Design a protein with these regions (language model features):
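Membrane-embedded, hydrophobic transmembrane alpha-helices
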Residues: 1-95
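Perimembrane helix-loop-helix junctions
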Residues: 302-335
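Extracytoplasmic
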Residues: 11, 17, 24, 476, ...
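Signature aromatic-anchored transmembrane alpha helix within multi-pass, membrane-resident enzymes
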Residues: 333-341, 464-521
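Membrane-embedded helix bundles of polyisoprenyl
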Residues: 38-51, 101-111, 167, 183, ...
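Active-site lumenal/periplasmic loops and adjacent helix-entry segments of GT-C-fold
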Residues: 108-255, 531-541
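Hydrophobic, aromatic-rich transmembrane alpha-helices
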Residues: 310-311, 316, 385-409
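Membrane-helix boundary/interfacial segments in multi-pass membrane proteins
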Residues: 56-63, 119-127, 186, 239-252, ...
Length: 679
């Protein structure tokens, strides 16, 4: 199984980078930017292919999606060649440093994501994953991969939905890639999801982070190199996103979003030709489309980070004008700021945005607590990271002293405000206005704050390194040496200073520290421990390995075309997405709502009476169900594991016993049963 995971990881890298590299090759002469943008183009091409194939009625699979995506990427490449003729020589100056980024990220990803897995196919059993895995499964079954038709019940005709299904847009970039990978390799869906998540953490994120640091610091090699050790040490991003809820699509879109920043900065850079600006502009537009497919709130995340940059660029562009009057840069900055506010308000009031911006998450901490988390980099609800807090503070002070970097400090302050509001404020118009684009979810906003803090942490690390080098110079160690010795000593100081910074950053990854009788857990130790607990597939899990094994045996006994009535809160809601079982109830919520089908209500509440009630028989017939699956008899376990469970809603199923009229035992193992419906 672990070899299968390795195979899936390698396959995923090919899926994300071969088409994307073809498409991005002609748009930038810098290899690091090309590689950073490759997965953005690939994800866009797969989603676009799924949409087109859905419109023309072609069954989507790896065999039909991949050729279409390759053709689309080739078209993108040819357009880039036409725009950027003649092609500039390739700039590979940062490739070696990018490799360092990836190597470090691989080590961290293995520790934080792979080792906590309870087997390569284990998964976190939460609400988000019911939908995420279920949507990918529906793609594979239905062959309809359109993001406008995503649903747990959007399947071939003949299978009824127990809930009113309204085909609407849902960002399904993550689901599409998982479906492509599963279709290509034939491996389990959960294993393919783990492979893709690992690639996001270990490949997409570090490459995009390297390109991000390079573009905002004008490709300063010292800062880019230090970024390799600084960018992975903030636990809130991307690592926490893989553990909380978990937010796989946001982890993908935020990680790739760092590459989109490069296109935006390149479009507004002082240097570069008109063709370069056009190329970066088109890449930026493709990136925004990719965000639309992956997770649209990434657009607002990047916007929150780059608002100060835009205002600063407006000032600088006008100030550099030869005919500029003294007040015009200020006017330009004000107009830019007003335009951004108006765009924010316009988006906030769009009708289709209301379900998002009006959604509310309860506060996770107090106002003083959220401020403390920001100052000590312990957000969201993580153990503090003193090293990173010190680097961010030093970088913040330095950025405020330089007109070229002051926007970074302002960006961090704004994102810190967003986090404090989302984490501590009760429902209010201000909270919805400022953080509604992220569902007012403090975990998502914490990732935005972490991204805004990356440049400051790099500046802080640079200052620390220069301070250490300066200590050596101040001691005049080489005043009486020849030239060669001076060079050796200089390089030694540079190496020692870099080593000190590396060791400082490495402290962030220490799982725990023992101080006498006190054990202090580090942020990454906390994530690894929590992830290990959430990934368990033991009998204490909602859907355990033994239950999954029973479901597979049950599927062998159920004729093709028949569905299985289940009680989802015994863990069987995951039987559909993980094991491809045709269960009727496959969502975590919606039962008892206005959107539930009356037949569904009747089945939930009165299935045990099927032997004498014709209305129950008719309801069962409407779902094409011939069997009943029960995995757990103890309602207390369902209460403890799923807060949405209300035992009184499921008495029609949970009351069925081996001697209930109208049912026949087909399989049994402990409390687990598969019944055949006899009437």
């Amino acid at each position: 199984m672990w070899l299968e995971l390795c195979f899936a990881i390698i396959s995923c890298i090919f899926l994300l980078y071969v088409p994307g590299l073809i498409g991005a090759a002609s748009w930038s002469s810098r290899i690091d930017e090309t590689v950073a943008f490759a997965p953005i183009i690939s994800v866009t091409s797969y989603c676009f292919a799924g949409l087109v194939l859905s419109l023309v009625g072609v069954f989507a699979s790896a065999a039909t999606i991949i050729p279409f995506a390759l053709a689309w990427c080739l078209a993108v490449y040819l357009v880039g060649r036409l725009i950027r003729r003649p092609v500039s020589p390739r700039d590979a100056s940062l490739v070696g440093i990018v490799v360092v980024y990836v190597c470090i990220a691989i080590l961290v990803s293995v520790f934080v994501y792979i080792l906590p897995l309870d087997g390569p196919g284990s998964f976190v059993q939460t609400y988000d994953n019911v939908h995420q895995y279920g949507t990918a499964r529906t793609f594979l079954i239905s062959g309809d991969w359109s993001p406008f038709n995503s649903s747990l019940y959007s399947v071939p005709s003949g299978e009824a939905s127990v809930l009113d299904v309204v085909n609407a847009f849902y960002p399904s970039g993550w689901h599409t890639v998982v479906a492509v990978l599963a279709s290509l390799t034939g491996l389990s869906l959960s294993l393919c999801a783990n492979a893709f998540n690992f690639v996001v953490l270990a490949v997409i994120f570090p490459i995009a982070a390297a390109s991000f640091v390079a573009c905002i610091f004008n490709r300063d090699r010292e800062k880019v190199l230090l970024g390799a050790f600084v960018t992975p040490i903030c636990a809130a991003f991307p690592w926490m996103l893989m553990e909380s809820w978990p937010l796989f699509p946001n982890a993908l879109s935020f990680s790739a979003g760092l590459g989109i920043v490069c296109a935006f900065v390149g479009m507004l850079a002082d240097s570069g030709t008109a063709k370069d600006r056009i190329a970066y502009g088109i890449m930026f537009i493709i990136g925004i489309v990719a965000c639309f497919f992956m997770q649209p709130n990434t657009v607002f995340s990047l916007g929150a980070m780059l608002v100060p940059f835009c205002i600063w660029r407006a000032w600088k562009l006008v100030a550099l004008s030869n005919s500029c009057r003294k007040h015009r840069p200020l006017v330009a900055s004000l107009l830019c700021g007003i335009a951004i506010v108006l765009i924010w308000l316009f988006a906030f009031n769009l009708p289709f945005m209301q379900p998002v911006v009006q959604y509310h998450w309860a506060p996770i901490t107090t106002l003083p607590g959220s401020i403390k988390e920001v100052l000590l980099v312990g957000y969201p609800l993580l153990p503090v990271n003193i090293v990173l807090a010190a680097l961010v503070f030093i970088g913040f002070v330095r950025s405020c002293r330089n007109a070229e970097t002051v926007w970074m400090a302002i960006s961090y302050l704004f994102c810190a405000l967003l986090y404090i509001v989302s984490a501590s404020m009760e429902p209010s118009f201000i909270k919805q206005l400022l953080t509604g684009f992220w569902y007012t979810d403090a975990y998502r906003v914490a990732s935005v704050l972490a991204m805004a803090g990356l440049p400051l942490a790099v500046l802080g690390a640079c200052d620390v390194r220069q301070f250490i080098v300066g200590l050596g110079c101040a001691r005049n160690l080489d005043t009486r040496t020849d030239g060669i010795t001076a060079v050796v000593l200089g390089r030694a100081r540079a190496g020692i200073s870099l080593l000190v910074v590396v060791l400082m950053c490495a402290v962030s990854f220490v799982p725990f520290i023992v101080l006498g009788d006190t054990v202090l857990q580090g942020p990454f130790g906390f994530i690894a421990t929590s992830s290990e607990s959430h990934n368990t597939m033991s009998d204490s899990a909602g859907y355990s390995l033994s239950e999954s094994s029973f479901v597979k045996k049950a599927m062998a006994a159920v004729p093709e075309g028949e569905t299985i009535i289940n009680m989802p809160y015994d863990g069987s809601m995951f039987a559909y997405s993980i094991d491809d079982a045709p269960v009727v109830f496959r969502t975590m919520e919606g039962y008892g709502s206005k959107g539930e089908d009356p037949d569904s209500v009747l089945i939930r509440e009165a299935l045990c009476d099927i032997s004498w009630r014709q209305d129950v028989r008719d309801a069962v017939e409407s779902t094409h169900a011939g069997y009943v699956l029960i995995l757990e008899r103890d309602p207390d376990k369902a209460d403890a594991y799923y807060t949405q469970h209300h035992r009184e809603q499921w008495t029609g199923i949970t009351s069925i016993a081996d001697d209930t009229p109208g049912f026949e035992v087909v399989l049994k193992d402990g409390d687990m049963r598969l019944y055949r419906i006899l009437v």
